[in-house]
Amino acid sequence: MTIINSNLGYPRLGEHREWKHLLEHFWKGQLDNVTFHATAKKLRLANLKKQRDLGVDYIPVADNSDYDHVLDTLVAFNAIPSRFGHFDHQLDLPDYYAIARGTDTAVAAEMTKWFNINYHYIVPEFDDVSFKLLDNRWLRYYQEAKQELGIDGKPVILGPISFLKLGKRHGQYLDDAAVNELLPQLLPLYQQVFEELATAGAKWIQLDEPTLVKTTTVAELAPYQTALEHLHAAVPSLKIELQTYFDSLDQYDKIVTWPIQALGLDLVHDHGENLAHLVDHGFPTDKILAAGIIDGHNVWASDLQAKLALVQQLRQIVTDDQLWLQPANSLLHVPITTKNETKADPVLLGGLAFADQKLAELHTLTVAANQGVAAVQAVFDHNQANLTALNQSSHRNNQSVRAAEAQLSNQKFERQAPFATRIKLQHDRLHLPLLPTTTIGSFPQSAQVRAKRAAWRKGNLTDADYQAFLHAETKRWIKLQEDLGLDVLVHGEFERTDMVEYFGQKLTGFYATQNGWVQSYGSRGVRPPVIFGDVAYTEPITVAESVYAQSLTDQPVKGMLTAPLTIINWSFVRDDIPRAQVQNQIALALRQEVQNLEKAGIKIIQVDEPALREGLPLKQRHWQAYLDEAVYSFKITTTGVQNDTQIHTHMCYSNFADIINTIKALDADVISIETSRSHGEIISAFEQTGYDQEIGLGVYDIHSPRVPSVAEIEANIQRALRVIDARQFWINPDCGLKTRQESETLAALKNMIAARNAIQAQLTTSIH
């Protein structure tokens, strides 16, 4: 009897972002369809071959995508919104991308976070849907791997219940009644996919049902069980690996009895609950336990001794031929390899493991389990030495940080006066009109901006020349903002590659990777910083840029910071101390930056917390602790200023109805929220609960290249004003504008100002 290993999914971007560049060249018309598909195939096959070379026994296929796997699923099953047309065949690339990116006449499909991590998926729309199988992509990619590489892969498909539950009908996520209504129409198509795979020789299929971890009652299990019983009965020769991840299964004892041949459990992010279920209830002798023992969305090297001890514990529950070792979730959410991190501190590098290194760890653990540790003793010894060196390093033992942490309990973090008092002082100081306009922070980073930054980083541009260029670009955009008629300006953030990475480069305890790219949405890659040590403030981060921008105009320019929780939610966070401790270290550092901005004369300071909602634990029983920690760290950051300094915050891509009280507890003077793609859900939430502070609900979607009309923006503003007093309301886009083209940005902002002016003229009330 032998233990084997399995992978759940592999990163798409490419080791040097080849996939990203492929998509963007196609969108710009620089590639034809034939070249696109040939290049995409080359990348797919290279990824499969690499996994085979790294010793993966069961290699996933069809986990690749041309944009997003949920989009792939809705396109395959014809859940295509009617505004994009009607189809009876596999979509060509322009039609496929229109759904994700929008067109001049059709608004892009909504995009939101994939569970509680920084990946975005396209939200299916099930209004008047007529399911049919337009493309069995799972069969195509299974056959490709088999024919080209001789790999008998494991097709990966999003399960029918998760597919439905991740989508919306009439603007609302589907409840169980809606799922039960649509499931009979969808199941025959899944059955067809399964049948065609079985006919082609597939032995296993990985059926991802990630929403299963969010079920808490037996009643919620019914549609999952119905689907699995149907599929197994219809295609008994195709073995089903029911894969879950990101948390534990509350109804494990029921789920494990279903007609599946393998159950994939997350043993990393489960709060220890899945392992407790296994110990308490055991595991059926006729199924495979696919044990997710390697962290698939953090970058730390595993403690191989501890992981092998876990494997030995699992061997007390199942036999070796019942045990697969695998990542806890798809490796889509980590960078590809550490081999390109040539500038990293060797002590840090020894503690890192990206996708390829994680697969190597799996192989090592598989060998150790089957042949004994002696077969890989050198690898184990090297692993322990690396982990010890990192944990004992000065990076993780900063005594000044420890002293500051020790004083936290002795301090009260509240603004000096209540909001009603503060806002009057701020109005007197700022002299803003009714319905003030602003943007969220960043402006388009042109090819020239990126080229100058790259040249500077390579040493081909002096510091002085680079600074002169940044000043020129800032000056140009201050003038553009004034000409547009914006009321509160921003400096544009041309010095920043990323709203989190930039801060990581300025604080201790962070490592900015050279090539640690992960997919955020579509072709957009981000390089999350690695928080590997104690975080401390050493010098001003944003003050010089903000002061320079303010010197160019009499209008207020916002200082722009990223809040602690977003920094850790969008970073790879050290796992040797609690996340809340890291969060508070960052807050203490940023508090000094906020105070330095105020001392430099900046009147408005925006502390962005876009990732607050998305980072919520999947199970509600864990929410309150998370939210309390979020409020606490935000207040550490923002409460050290005077009453007439206005604190803004921004949030995006989230459903806020269930955290309105937390938003209020932040006590920000002004909050801006992304709303355009969520079709008014957030407006409804504020209508139900009320909100006293000032607020900007994004009036147009920046994630699409289309330019909204004045009438469209006016309608969005008018809808918000039915719920929110005009004296509280700000006018702004959804999010930052870094990824947009300059022409799109200027046209959209021009229309936004025109819409504001038209509505402003209709209002007789003034807040000043």
From Swiss-Prot:
InterPro entries: Cbl-indep_Met_Synth_N (IPR013215), Cobalamin-indep_Met_synthase (IPR006276), Met_Synth_C/arc (IPR002629), UROD/MetE-like_sf (IPR038071). 5-methyltetrahydropteroyltri-L-glutamate binds at R17, E18, W19, K20, K113, W570, E614. The keyword Repeat applies. Binds 1 zinc ion per subunit. Zn(2+) binds at H650, C652, E674, C735. The active site is at H703. Its cofactor is Zn(2+). Pathway: Amino-acid biosynthesis; L-methionine biosynthesis via de novo pathway; L-methionine from L-homocysteine (MetE route): step 1/1. One of its GO terms (biological process) is methionine biosynthetic process. L-methionine binds at I440, G441, S442, E493, D608. It holds the Pfam family Meth_synt_1. Coiled coil: none annotated. L-homocysteine binds at I440, G441, S442, E493, D608. It is an enzyme of class 2 (transferase). Gene3D superfamilies: 3.20.20.210. GO terms for molecular function: 5-methyltetrahydropteroyltriglutamate-homocysteine S-methyltransferase activity; zinc ion binding. Keywords: Amino-acid biosynthesis, Metal-binding, Methionine biosynthesis, Methyltransferase, Repeat, Transferase, Zinc. Its EC number is 2.1.1.14. It catalyses: 5-methyltetrahydropteroyltri-L-glutamate + L-homocysteine = tetrahydropteroyltri-L-glutamate + L-methionine. HAMAP family: Meth_synth. Catalyzes the transfer of a methyl group from 5-methyltetrahydrofolate to homocysteine resulting in methionine formation. PANTHER family: 5-METHYLTETRAHYDROPTEROYLTRIGLUTAMATE--HOMOCYSTEINE METHYLTRANSFERASE. Belongs to the vitamin-B12 independent methionine synthase family. This is 5-methyltetrahydropteroyltriglutamate--homocysteine methyltransferase.
